[in-house]
Amino acid sequence: MATSHNLPAEPGTAPVGCLAPGTITPMRKVPADIVRPEYVGKPTANEGNDSNMYTPEEVERVRAAGRVAAGAIVEAAKIAVPGTTTDQIDVLVHEYICDHGAYPSTVDYRGYPKSVCTSL
């Protein structure tokens, strides 16, 4: 069985057929020029205003965010094979989102350290 100190660095090369506990790596940095959501660094998030009305500019921003998110899912799916660790998927998604000028929305949401929430 693999242990946290000998998991492979390359996607698809971890032992197959069992789940092994890994090490939770530190929160990855987001480039300083990427705008942070209001919840970053706070223990709780604001409830919001429950408004479903968006300006045309806001609609375009939501569409752009959706395109980045869809691209991140496509890239993650390419390496989501037996032997790939969830941390390897997180690295790929984090870099993809940041490279597209966006903030990985789960990073530092109520202290969550990752760009991806993964279930096994």
Regions found by a protein language model. Give the residues of each.
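Active-site neighborhoods and metal-handling regions in enzymes and metal-associated proteins
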Residues: M1-L120
